[in-house]
Amino acid sequence: MKDRVLGKDLKVSPVGLGCMGMTHAYGAPADEKEMAKLLEKAVDMGYTFFDTAECYTGVRPDGTTAYNEELVGEALKPFRDKVVIATKCGVRHLGDRLEVDCSPQAIRKAVEGSLRRLQTDHIDLYYQHRVDPNVEPEVVADTMAQLMKEGKITHWGISEASEDYLRRAHAVCPVTAIQNRLSMMYRDYEALFPTLEELNVGFVAFSPLANGLLSACYRDTSQFENSAA
C-alpha cells in the first residue's frame, strides 16, 4: 500500500487496522493467539497503522482483564520499527457510562501505562480520546507538547474534536490528526475538512463501515436476539 502522510510527517498505510473489537465492545475477548496471527498477517499485507486505546479492555472467561494494548504490543513487537501505533488516553468505561479525565495528571499517568502495556519506549500517535469539558484545550495541548519533548510520544491527535477545540489546541501544539466518526451513514464531520486542509491536520475516520451496517453482512431479513443488537 502506498503511504499517506498525516499532518506534517507521519507516514501511515492508507487503511489502518482498528483493534478495539479484539478485546472490547463486541462480546468476549477474541482468542489472543488468533489475534496475534491476524496482526502479523496485517503487517505482511502492508498495514503499517494500528489503533488501540487504554480503555479497550474486556473480561476473559477466567475473570481476568484482557488489555488491548498488551495484545497489540506483544504481537507487533517484532515489527516495531516498521509500524505506527496509535493509542488514546482520557476515557474510562464505568458500566454504560464514560468517565472523561484529560487533566495533565491523568494524561501523564495514562501514557506511562500505555508505554508499559505496549512494550515500547514511545507512542507514535497519542490521541485525546474525548474532549473533557473541564479541561481547556490549551492545557491538554501543553501537556502533549511536554510529552513530545520528553520523547514519550512523537505526534498527537484528538478524537471527536470540533473546529473551535482543534484550532485552540493546534495553536499551542500542532495536531497531527483528528479521529472522528465518518461513513456514508454519518457525514457530519465533513464540515471540518476545509479547516483540516488549512491547518495541515490529517483525518482518520473511525467506523467507516457504520459499525458493520455497510459491510454487506446484513440484509433486510436479518434478525437479532433483541432490539439492543
Regions found by a protein language model. Give the residues of each.
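Conserved, mostly hydrophobic/aromatic
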Residues: 17, 35, 50, 72, ...
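Generic structural signal for well-ordered alpha-helices
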Residues: 3, 39, 69-73, 111-115, ...
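Beta/alpha (TIM)-barrel catalytic core signal, keyed to glycine-rich beta->alpha loops juxtaposed to Asp/Glu
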Residues: 131-229
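Short, well-ordered coil/turn segments that N-cap beta-strands
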Residues: 10-15, 46-48, 79-83, 120-124, ...
